[in-house]
A protein has these predicted regions:
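N-terminal, active-site-proximal structural segment of metallo-dependent hydrolase catalytic domains
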Residues: 1-56, 60-73, 146, 246
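Active-site-proximal beta-strand elements of phosphoester/diester hydrolases
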Residues: 2-11, 89-91, 121-131
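Active-site environment of divalent metal-dependent phosphoester hydrolases
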Residues: 12-15, 38-42, 67-69, 98, ...
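Active-site neighborhood of phospho(di)ester-bond hydrolases with catalytic His/Asp-centered motifs
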Residues: 32-34, 60-62, 160-164, 183-186
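Structured beta-strand-rich core segments of catalytic domains in phosphoester-bond hydrolases
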Residues: 35-121, 228-231
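His/acidic metal-ligating clusters that form di-metal
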Residues: 112-125, 138-162
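Active-site-proximal segments of metal-dependent phosphoesterases and phosphodiesterases across multiple
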Residues: 128-148, 169-178
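Metal-dependent phosphoester-hydrolase catalytic domains
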Residues: 153-159, 166-246
Length: 246
């Protein structure tokens, strides 16, 4: 059976209705995605909003929380599916801090769903690894990656993983992933970041599409028939769309 898988960091500042439009345009069956936010004062819940607009099943879990931030109280990752979700799980790979002082200190979470694809099980996982200026792989980031690898190392069949790994193709993070799973996204030379000018508190800027930070991996039994970087005006990351056979 052929499925379309979409991986996208939607950027929490983006117009959520534009994100919905682009997801619909992709005709994706399963979406792994990052930077969903919640705020109780405005009843904001971007993961639920997207799921409702698509008519999809979904699972979201918070990675970290803040007090007194105008734009968000919580941020996390989500998986959306055209098919029923049989079970879910989540694991923190960097514990939540509540009011983290910078991006490296933020909690990071692995989110997983088991889907029933017309009688066939398919496990989908996602995460959003820590940001460092220049995407430097520090010892802390290596530890975070190792925590993630310990989760996925036994995923040998019917498994897909999409994520913003905040790491380039030649990094420790990606090299470790390649020992466990196969790339089912486009060639690593195709870039996904920054789709819009990026400025991290004046410490680090990216003006153009200079980096590949977003990936789709799968167990060896899954065959990829097509993969592309989607062009869009929205979000600071470009989405990856792949067609797979299970």
């Amino acid at each position: 059976m052929t499925l379309k898988i979409l991986q996208w960091n939607i950027w929490y500042k983006e117009d959520i209705d534009k994100i919905v439009e682009e997801i619909k345009r992709s005709q994706a069956d399963v979406i792994t995605a990052q930077e969903f936010i919640q705020h109780s004062a405005t009843d904001l819940d971007t993961a639920k909003y997207i799921a409702d607009k698509l008519g999809f099943n979904y699972f979201y879990h918070t990675a970290d929380t803040w007090s007194g931030r105008e734009e968000k109280e919580a941020q996390g990752n989500a998986i959306f599916s055209r098919f029923p979700i049989v079970s879910t799980q989540h694991t923190y790979i960097n514990p939540p801090k509540h009011n983290p002082v910078n991006a490296l200190e933020e909690g990071r979470i692995y989110v997983e769903t088991t889907l029933d694809v017309k009688g066939e099980p398919l496990v989908a996982g996602t995460t959003h690894l820590s940001f460092t200026p220049g995407f430097e792989i520090t010892e802390q980031r290596k530890k975070e990656a190792d925590n993630l690898i310990n989760i996925i190392k036994n995923k040998k069949t019917n498994y897909i993983f999409g994520a913003d790994l905040n790491a380039g193709p030649d990094s420790y993070v990606i090299k470790e992933f390649e020992k466990q799973l196969s790339n089912v996204g486009p060639d690593y030379r195709e870039k996904t970041f920054a789709n819009q000018p990026f400025d991290y508190y004046g410490m680090y800027q990216v003006e153009d599409l200079e980096w590949r930070l977003d990936y789709l991996f799968a167990s060896d039994d899954i065959k990829v028939t097509n993969a592309q970087i989607m062009e869009t005006e929205y979000s600071d990351h470009l989405p990856i769309l792949a067609e797979i056979e299970i």
